[in-house]
């Protein structure tokens, strides 16, 4: 392919799914160009690696490209897409380009409604510790690597498989993980949950006869499709029939300690005593998927244990910003950021926070993501948002969707008040959220910012705002403004 296609252009190169593929292609020696609406740390990193980054979208950006890569977020009337079509330049969906990368190595694809990014990161970390040096493409920044993608020298590529647009059906890996199946992105499946489950069944059919489907049998919907999976299966979870099973799990100082019982290939492996450097039972399940794959690939047990104990996490997945001084300067609160945006994953993250920080007030700053999701999961959002001790609620991050009546931030605020679960503070403009957090936070609080939209910038803004306030206080104490 390389002797034909040398110049590859990405429309929306700064996106999490796009940037990782672009980085791997750069490392493979392709010339990569890309456009995005604004500059970011991601686009700046790609530029330092050799990519040509252009601001905004214009027809001339595709000049010289042999292929144009787009994600489902890119509209068909984008000027670069129209120009590529007019010039007969192939327009390649992101998932198809990922599938091409997977053809170069043996693919490990992580699917599921929740937990894909963390599980992919755990798998990549364990395989790397085991000396397999995998290539990985992740939807979040792997902190230990400082990037969301890397080209390894080993035989495997580990990547997320996206069910949101059914594009995971383009992939043909040798190992698949299904973490769970939940009602999300239902527009793709005609609001028919049976069609969503059927898509996951079809995903397992992409495996070769020697492939393995690694399935979390704690999830009732995954268990339901189990009889229809015709390829070899490894079951994992807390369930008694799991072949890779966690027992005696407990939270200790923000980590999870548990024992893993493994019954694979007809014989018992030695039990593993694991300390996972992540909180929450859901992350124990994610780690079990990584342990199952590592065991199948004969990664030494000591490497598995070491990788999980030293795992440094993923950007925006229970990412800790440390202790931040309160506005009055008389105490501190713990600041955490998380990507959770579906009620199920939000509940798991909040439960993890309760386990990691027992007896502390939990303050949630939440920005709903997409009007359609807010509409479809409205009652579940009310239920999970009502479990925190204090709530700062932002307006919905539209992600390109038009507003939907009674499915916005104000509607959620009213519903929570009617339910008498909590008295939320509605923060209409996300730019005002950092100050709202500082106004609400008390000494000893745990404050979590949560959502898949622009709220990801808020924790850094909180830290910067408080640093400015402290500097101003120092200036005042010294008797005037600094010269």
Curated annotation (Swiss-Prot):
Domain of life: Bacteria
SUPFAM superfamilies on file: MurCD N-terminal domain, MurD-like peptide ligases, catalytic domain, MurD-like peptide ligases, peptide-binding domain
Gene Ontology MF terms in the entry: ATP binding; UDP-N-acetylmuramate-L-alanine ligase activity
Principal localisation: cytoplasm
Residue sites binding ATP per the record: 112-118
Coiled-coil residues: none
Catalytic reaction(s) noted: UDP-N-acetyl-alpha-D-muramate + L-alanine + ATP = UDP-N-acetyl-alpha-D-muramoyl-L-alanine + ADP + phosphate + H(+)
Gene3D superfamilies in the cross-refs: Mur ligase, C-terminal domain, Mur-like, catalytic domain, NAD(P)-binding Rossmann-like Domain
InterPro entries to which the protein is assigned, alphabetical: Mur-like_cat_sf, Mur_ligase_C, Mur_ligase_C_dom_sf, Mur_ligase_cen, Mur_ligase_N, MurCDEF_pg_biosynth, UDP-N-AcMur_Ala_ligase_MurC
Keywords annotated in UniProt: ATP-binding, Cell cycle, Cell division, Cell shape, Cell wall biogenesis/degradation, Cytoplasm, Ligase, Nucleotide-binding, Peptidoglycan synthesis
Keyword S-adenosyl-L-methionine recorded: no
Enzyme Commission number(s) from the entry: 6.3.2.8
Top EC group: ligase
Localization: Cytoplasm
Family: Belongs to the MurCDEF family.
Protein name: UDP-N-acetylmuramate--L-alanine ligase
């Amino acid at each position: 392919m390389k002797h034909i296609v040398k110049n590859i252009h990405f429309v929306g190169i700064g996106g999490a799914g796009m940037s990782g593929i672009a980085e791997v292609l750069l490392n493979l020696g392709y010339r990569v160009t890309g456009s995005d609406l604004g500059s970011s740390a991601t686009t700046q990193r790609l530029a330092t690696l050799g990519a040509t980054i252009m601001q905004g979208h214009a027809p001339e950006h595709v000049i010289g490209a042999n292929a144009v890569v787009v994600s489902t977020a890119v509209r068909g009337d984008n000027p670069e897409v129209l120009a590529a079509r007019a010039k007969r330049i192939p327009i390649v969906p992101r998932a198809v380009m990922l599938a091409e990368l997977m053809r170069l190595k043996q693919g490990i694809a992580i699917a599921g409604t929740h937990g894909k990014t963390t599980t992919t990161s755990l798998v990549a970390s364990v395989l790397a510790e085991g000396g397999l040096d995998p290539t990985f493409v992740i939807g979040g920044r792997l902190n230990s690597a400082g990037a969301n993608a890397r080209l390894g020298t080993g035989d495997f590529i580990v990547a997320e498989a996206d069910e949101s647009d059914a594009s995971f059906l383009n992939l043909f890996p040798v190992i698949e993980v299904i973490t769970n199946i939940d009602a999300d992105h239902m527009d793709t499946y005609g609001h028919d949950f049976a069609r969503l489950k059927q898509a996951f069944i079809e995903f397992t059919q992409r495996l070769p006869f020697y492939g393995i489907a690694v399935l979390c049998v704690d999830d009732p919907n995954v268990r339901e499709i189990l009889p229809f999976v015709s390829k070899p299966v490894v079951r994992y979870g807390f369930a008694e029939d799991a072949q890779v099973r966690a027992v005696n799990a407990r939270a200790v100082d923000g980590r999870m300690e548990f024992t893993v019982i493994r019954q694979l290939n007809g014989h018992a492996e030695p039990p593993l005593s694991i300390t996972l450097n992540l909180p929450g039972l859901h992350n124990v399940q994610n780690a079990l998927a990584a342990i199952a794959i590592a065991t199948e690939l004969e990664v030494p047990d000591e490497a598995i244990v070491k990788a999980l104990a030293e795992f440094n996490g993923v950007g925006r997945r229970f990412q800790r910003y440390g202790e931040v001084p309160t506005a009055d300067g008389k105490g501190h609160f713990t600041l955490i950021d998380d990507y959770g945006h579906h009620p199920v994953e939000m509940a798991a993250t909040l439960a993890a926070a309760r386990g990691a920080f027992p007896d502390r007030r939990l303050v949630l700053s939440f920005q709903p993501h997409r009007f359609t999701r807010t509409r479809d999961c409205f009652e579940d959002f009310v239920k999970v948002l009502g479990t925190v001790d204090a709530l700062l609620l932002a307006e919905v991050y539209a992600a390109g969707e038009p507003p939907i009546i009674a499915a916005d931030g104000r509607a959620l605020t009213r519903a929570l008040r009617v339910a008498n679960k909590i008295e939320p503070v509605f923060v209409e403009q996300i730019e005002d959220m950092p100050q709202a957090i500082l106004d609400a936070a008390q000494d000893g609080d745990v404050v979590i910012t949560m959502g898949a939209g622009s709220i990801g910038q808020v924790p850094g803004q909180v830290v910067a705002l408080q640093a400015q306030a402290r500097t101003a206080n120092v200036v005042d104490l010294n008797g005037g403004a600094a010269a």
